[in-house]
């Protein structure tokens, strides 16, 4: 009875709290039916901030995965510290360098097995679930230059990426003398032609 009482007192002293997310998901929207989508985990989430800094991207600490360690160690854009925690090099935190980093990562990924692969159906999206938290590269075979980077953390364990695939279509029309629009028109030198 005394042991039960001690256990009850200890249990009452433990505050209720929600455990942080340990798994995440990545959804790719605007997918093309029959095309292959792959994800590669570049960095593992090792620790994260607490309190007021928990929602800041600087609160999270990442280390290179085993497959990506050589890429990260030789990267122009990332810098591992003595403990292996990775940060962006200060001079490379701009859109152009992040784009260049993702291109270099995509080239490196060509020689690796992906962490997950899905073939899109006609639903217009694919979702990768049960992912360990970290920093991911997403590629597709819609366009060989198609890639995206996303971070899954304890405060944002899910990410949605909108794929930009294909070139925009342009419909060309020319105005007829009658004011209607069509595919062609006759004109003389000096005539005004609206198109």
Task: Explain the meaning of each model-derived region.
Residues 1-195:
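Solvent-exposed loop/turn and edge beta-strand elements of beta-rich ligand-binding domains
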């Amino acid at each position: 009875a005394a042991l039960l009482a001690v256990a009850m007192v200890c249990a009452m002293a433990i505050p209720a709290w929600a455990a942080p997310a340990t798994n995440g998901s990545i959804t790719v929207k605007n997918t093309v039916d029959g095309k292959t989508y792959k994800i590669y985990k570049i960095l593992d989430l090792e620790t994260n901030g607490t309190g007021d800094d928990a929602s800041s991207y600087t609160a999270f600490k990442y280390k290179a995965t085993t497959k990506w360690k050589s890429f990260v160690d030789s990267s122009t854009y990332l810098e591992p510290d003595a403990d292996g925690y990775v940060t962006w090099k200060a001079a490379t935190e701009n859109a152009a360098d992040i784009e260049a980093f993702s291109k270099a990562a995509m080239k490196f990924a060509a020689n690796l097995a992906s962490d997950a692969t899905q073939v899109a159906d006609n639903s217009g999206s694919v979702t990768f679930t049960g992912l360990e938290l970290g920093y991911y590269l997403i590629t597709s075979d819609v366009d060989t230059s198609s890639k995206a980077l996303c971070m899954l953390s304890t405060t944002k364990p899910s990410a949605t990426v909108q794929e930009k695939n294909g070139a925009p279509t342009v419909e060309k029309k020319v105005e007829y003398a009658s004011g209607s629009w069509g595919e062609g028109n006759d004109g003389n030198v000096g005539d005004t032609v609206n198109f």
